[in-house]
């Protein structure tokens, strides 16, 4: 909990809900009480709405991961909270939490870690990010993307992630466009020559069409296109 406060994942204004029971029945009761508290507060029409942070210890989380009834309470509770902290958990439990959320929701999950104990979690998520640092390169080598420091995550997602999505989309659409353009002209020419098999282009022209004639626009768009500046993307995260 102290680390959550120090990294500002949990703020002083949040109400912290702690689940640290050892028995499955006690864990179920604690989760249900916390969920009732969060839902009751959300139902009250007052502003500003109180924010919650959920803290779950490893032995309680173990019951959640192996009991679907507990998972049915845990996930709605986690969705009502601004932050969820799982403490004193094993590397396997980290991966199982990701698998649980992945199985029960349609959201895209991102996992980030900096050590060997985060490898399973990183590989279980849709997108894995490894931080190369003092704890070695195991996480960075097993991840989809590697960064040097945690603070680079903001620019990686809001700027480079946004640009990459737009570049890939435009490149794919352009590839379809240039291919359709070529073969539609051949189709219309076939109507003109009564489908005799005569081609409208020389064989070398058709070979060079994708390799030379239409290659540069795809490369330029796929590498250099910036439909919005980096400063604007960081200033307005809603664009992400």
Regions found by a protein language model. Name each.
Residues 1:
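N-terminal phosphate-binding loop and flanking beta/alpha elements of the actin-like ATPase fold
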Residues 5-110, 115, 119, 123-240:
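Membrane-embedded transport module
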């Amino acid at each position: 909990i102290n680390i959550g406060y120090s990294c500002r994942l949990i703020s002083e204004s949040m109400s912290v809900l702690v689940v640290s029971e050892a028995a499955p029945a006690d864990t179920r009761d604690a989760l249900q009480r916390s969920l009732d508290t969060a839902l009751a507060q959300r139902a009250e029409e007052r502003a500003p709405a109180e924010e919650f942070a959920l803290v779950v210890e490893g032995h309680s989380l173990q019951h959640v991961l192996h009991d679907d009834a507990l998972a049915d309470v845990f996930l709605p509770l986690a969705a009502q909270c601004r932050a969820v902290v799982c403490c004193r958990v094993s590397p396997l439990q980290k991966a199982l939490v990701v698998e649980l959320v992945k199985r029960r929701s349609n959201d895209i999950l991102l996992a980030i870690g900096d050590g060997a104990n985060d490898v399973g979690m990183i590989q279980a998520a849709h997108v894995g990010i490894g931080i190369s640092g003092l704890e070695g390169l195991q996480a960075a080598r097993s991840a989809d993307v590697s960064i040097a420091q945690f603070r680079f995550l903001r620019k990686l997602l809001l700027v480079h992630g946004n640009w990459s999505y737009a570049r890939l989309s435009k490149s794919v659409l352009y590839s379809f466009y240039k291919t359709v353009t070529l073969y539609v002209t051949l189709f219309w020419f076939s109507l003109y020559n009564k489908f005799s098999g005569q081609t409208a282009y020389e064989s070398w022209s058709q070979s060079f069409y994708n390799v030379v004639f239409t290659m540069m626009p795809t490369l330029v768009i796929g590498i250099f296109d910036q439909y919005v500046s980096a400063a604007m993307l960081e200033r307005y995260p809603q664009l992400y």
